[in-house]
């Protein structure tokens, strides 16, 4: 077993301590409770406790939080020798991202009086940023070390926050469930990152890039958690009342349709009529991605079913046919197939948002037009103009993701980082003490580290 040299093994603890120290200092200087969290401010206004936003937002936050740490973490444990890293590095990267995103989004959205003011909505938005980072992590799963992932999160959270601010605040784009800002951005950031980190000798570890019965079973736990809580994910930032209610309903039915289409297509493309667990674990979730943008709009229940069915179909076909083409022709080594689960369904969701926005009328929304499309309600935009802004937002996201992912790949190629050698990718023992294997390891001579072939 090749080991990471001692000087490179110090990078992770140094980065953890440096990042925690820096964020702690910034929190001390800038971060304060908002008026619904601060004891003096809340009670000075003589508010009733039942009116506090905590009681409306915390249930959704709790579900989103579970999705980030349990759903994403366990979805990636399908690799037979990489379970510790899948869950553990998800834990590490997400916790750092939550702190960093709170600062970044705070400066952009809630900075006044010289301070960032935070509450439960800040927690939800930070979780969304962590979700995008973990999507990118899926593209390079098994081929990067924890220090590399921390640097990836450092850069990606900045670009995510700026892209989100441009779309939502400057362009007036509607993207409640993040088809563009979370899924499309995270997927294509990760794909371009993977392209820059391409390994020509990855075949040396290909025997580890497979699953076994138990690893697939644990990954299915992640799928079920994500599937069950996805309506909360899409509805968490939406306006209270009918908007949040409608978002849950649309997401719910879209997920059911994507699941049925995934089972159907998986059996059809297998050749012998048997199901592929990779398809079920991933493509069944595409319905939640595809309605992210349009979930708060008047999509209609039939529209949600149709969108989910299309997303499940496209995602399943992507896993079967498109992923091998991406690697062989475009040198994109997408470990988790994020292009199929998040990338293509995210683009479909953005286009769906364009179409539904173009059909927005006061007759369809009534006074609810003010909460879903405030610029149309105020007469500052037509429905067609809003649709064009939605489309432009998709292209802005792709630019940020592609340029950012490429820059991130160059950053992660720095020689002092903890990249695993080609022959030890998808292997927990490079970074973790694995029970039952330490004694056997000490009885074998350790090989010197092999150079990797990231080019």
Swiss-Prot record:
Cytoplasmic side: 1-10, 80-83, 143-148, 198-216, 271-274, 318-340, 412-455
Residue ranges the record marks as coiled coil: none
Extracellular domain ranges by topology: 32-58, 105-121, 170-176, 238-247, 296, 362-390
One annotated GO molecular function: ankyrin binding
Reactions performed catalytically: NH4(+)(in) = NH4(+)(out); methylamine(out) = methylamine(in); CO2(out) = CO2(in)
Membrane-protein topology: Multi-pass membrane protein
InterPro entries, per database record: Ammonium/urea_transptr, NH4_transpt_AmtB-like_dom, RhesusRHD
Tissue: Expressed in kidney by connecting segments and collecting tubules (at protein level).
Primary site of residence: membrane
Subcellular location(s) per record: Basolateral cell membrane; Cytoplasmic vesicle membrane
GO biological process terms, semicolon-separated: ammonium homeostasis; ammonium transmembrane transport; transepithelial ammonium transport
Record Pfam families: Ammonium_transp (PF00909)
Gene Ontology cellular component terms for the protein in this record: basolateral plasma membrane; cytoplasmic vesicle membrane; membrane; plasma membrane; spectrin-associated cytoskeleton
Region (Interaction with ANK3): 413-421
Post-translational modification: N-glycosylated.
Signal peptide span: none
Superkingdom of the organism of origin: Eukaryota
TM ranges: 11-31, 59-79, 84-104, 122-142, 149-169, 177-197, 217-237, 248-270, 275-295, 297-317, 341-361, 391-411
Residues carrying sugar: 46
Family recorded in the similarity comment: Belongs to the ammonium transporter (TC 2.A.49) family. Rh subfamily.
Summary of the function given for this chain in its UniProt record: Ammonium transporter involved in the maintenance of acid-base homeostasis. Transports ammonium and its related derivative methylammonium across the basolateral plasma membrane of epithelial cells likely contributing to renal transepithelial ammonia transport and ammonia metabolism. May transport either NH4(+) or NH3 ammonia species predominantly mediating an electrogenic NH4(+) transport. May act as a CO2 channel providing for renal acid secretion.
UniProt subunit comment: Interacts (via C-terminus) with ANK2 and ANK3; required for targeting to the basolateral membrane.
UniProt-recorded name of the protein: Ammonium transporter Rh type B
């Amino acid at each position: 077993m090749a080991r990471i040299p001692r000087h490179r093994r110090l990078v992770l603890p140094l980065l953890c301590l440096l990042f925690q120290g820096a964020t702690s200092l910034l929190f001390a200087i800038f971060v304060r409770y908002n008026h619904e969290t601060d004891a003096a401010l809340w009670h000075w206004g003589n508010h009733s406790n039942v009116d506090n936003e905590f009681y409306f937002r915390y249930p959704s936050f709790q579900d989103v939080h579970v999705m980030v740490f349990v759903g994403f973490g366990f979805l990636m444990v399908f690799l037979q020798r990489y379970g510790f890293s899948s869950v553990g590095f998800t834990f590490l990267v997400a916790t750092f991202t939550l702190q960093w995103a709170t600062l970044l989004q705070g400066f952009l959205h809630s900075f006044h009086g010289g301070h960032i003011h935070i509450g439960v909505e800040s927690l939800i938005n930070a979780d969304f940023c962590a979700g995008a980072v973990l999507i990118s992590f899926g593209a390079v799963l098994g081929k990067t070390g924890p220090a590399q992932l921390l640097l990836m999160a450092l850069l990606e959270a900045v670009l995510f926050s700026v892209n989100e601010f441009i779309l939502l605040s400057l362009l007036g784009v509607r993207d409640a469930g993040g088809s563009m800002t979370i899924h499309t951005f995270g997927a294509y950031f990760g794909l371009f990152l993977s392209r820059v980190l391409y390994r020509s000798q990855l075949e040396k570890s290909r025997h580890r890039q497979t699953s076994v019965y138990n690893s697939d079973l644990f990954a299915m736990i992640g799928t079920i958690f994500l599937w069950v809580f996805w309506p909360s994910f899409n509805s968490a930032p939406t306006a209270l009342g009918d908007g949040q209610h409608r978002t849950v309903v649309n997401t719910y039915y879209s997920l059911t349709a994507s699941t049925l289409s995934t089972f159907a297509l998986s059996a059809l493309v297998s050749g012998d009529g048997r199901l592929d667990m990779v398809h079920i674990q991933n493509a069944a979730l595409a319905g939640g991605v595809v309605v992210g943008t349009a979930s708060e709009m008047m999509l209609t229940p039939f529209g949600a079913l149709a969108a989910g069915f299309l997303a499940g179909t496209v995602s399943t076909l992507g896993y079967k046919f498109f992923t091998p083409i991406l690697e062989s022709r475009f040198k994109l080594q997408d470990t988790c197939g994020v292009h199929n689960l998040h990338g293509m369904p995210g683009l479909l969701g953005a286009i769906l948002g364009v179409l539904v926005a173009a059909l927005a009328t006061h007759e369809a929304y009534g006074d609810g037009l003010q909460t879903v499309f405030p610029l149309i309600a105020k007469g500052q935009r037509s429905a067609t103009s809003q649709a064009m802004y939605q489309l432009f937002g998709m292209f802005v996201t792709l630019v940020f993701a592609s340029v950012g992912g490429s820059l991130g790949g160059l950053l992660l190629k720095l020689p002092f980082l903890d990249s695993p050698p080609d022959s030890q990718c998808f292997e927990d023992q490079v970074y973790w003490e694995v029970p039952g294997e330490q004694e056997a390891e000490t009885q074998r001579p350790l090989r010197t580290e092999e150079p990797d072939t990231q080019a």
